[in-house]
UniProtKB/Swiss-Prot annotation:
Cross-referenced CDD domains: NUDIX_IPP_Isomerase
Complex and partners: Homodimer.
UniProt cross-references to HAMAP family, sorted A to Z: Idi
Keyword Flavoprotein appears in the UniProt entry: no
UniProt name for this protein: Isopentenyl-diphosphate Delta-isomerase
Pfam families hit by this protein: NUDIX
GO MF term list: isopentenyl-diphosphate delta-isomerase activity; metal ion binding
GO biological process: dimethylallyl diphosphate biosynthetic process; isoprenoid biosynthetic process
Chief localization: cytoplasm
Active site: C67, E116
Gene: idi
Main function: Catalyzes the 1,3-allylic rearrangement of the homoallylic substrate isopentenyl (IPP) to its highly electrophilic allylic isomer, dimethylallyl diphosphate (DMAPP).
Lineage, broadest ranks: Bacteria, Pseudomonadati, Pseudomonadota, Gammaproteobacteria, Enterobacterales
């Protein structure tokens, strides 16, 4: 895969430039564009993934299905599809927006900061997973209700962005719609 960049943003969310992805994530990470996605299978189960230990930020942490950064000229929806293929080896239905204005800043235990405007999407998988071990060290298909109870009881066990997304009332309602069998 070619070198990825992040799209830097000003405080109003307007693009101001780009920076190589690995170099962008430091103790002083600048605001940049990202995305987050929650994937469901045909049984209505949520895919929860554990980040590979080689990840710069939050290594080994359980999180929602896939996250990443759109590249210049790429829509967030196309970026979701690209990263699902790369990280999970999976095809998905067109991503649906569930929390379009999500923005957060969080610092991991090693001092690496995430500082993102991060629209959140949900989709259904349409093929089997083929996990990229460089990105994901473990995964589990779970009932959404069980995951939400786990987040409510032990938020420290999950990525901060997953917790913030899951505790948004409107996002929970939209996620619940994906648990219904089609």
């Amino acid at each position: 895969m070619q070198t990825e960049h992040v799209i830097l943003l000003n405080a109003q969310g307007v693009p101001t430039g780009t920076l190589e992805k690995y170099a962008a994530h430091t103790a002083d990470t600048l605001l940049h564009l990202a995305f987050s996605s929650w994937l469901f299978n045909a049984k209505g189960q949520l895919l929860v993934t554990r980040r590979a230990l080689s990840k710069k930020a939050w290594p080994g942490v359980w999180t929602n299905s896939v996250c990443g950064h759109p590249q210049l000229g790429e829509s967030s929806e196309d970026a979701v599809i690209r990263r699902c293929r790369y990280e999970l080896g999976v095809e998905i239905t067109p991503p649906e927006s569930i929390y379009p204005d999500f923005r957060y800043r969080a610092t991991d235990p090693r001092g690496i900061v995430e500082n993102e405007v991060c629209p959140v999407f949900a989709a259904r998988t349409t093929s089997a997973l083929q996990i990229n071990d460089d990105e994901v060290m473990d995964y589990q298909w779970c009932d959404l209700a069980d995951v939400l109870r786990g987040i409510d009881a032990t938020p420290w066990a999950f990525s901060p962005w997953m917790v913030m997304q899951a505790t948004n009332r409107e996002a929970r309602i939209r996620l619940s719609a994906f648990t219904q069998l089609k």
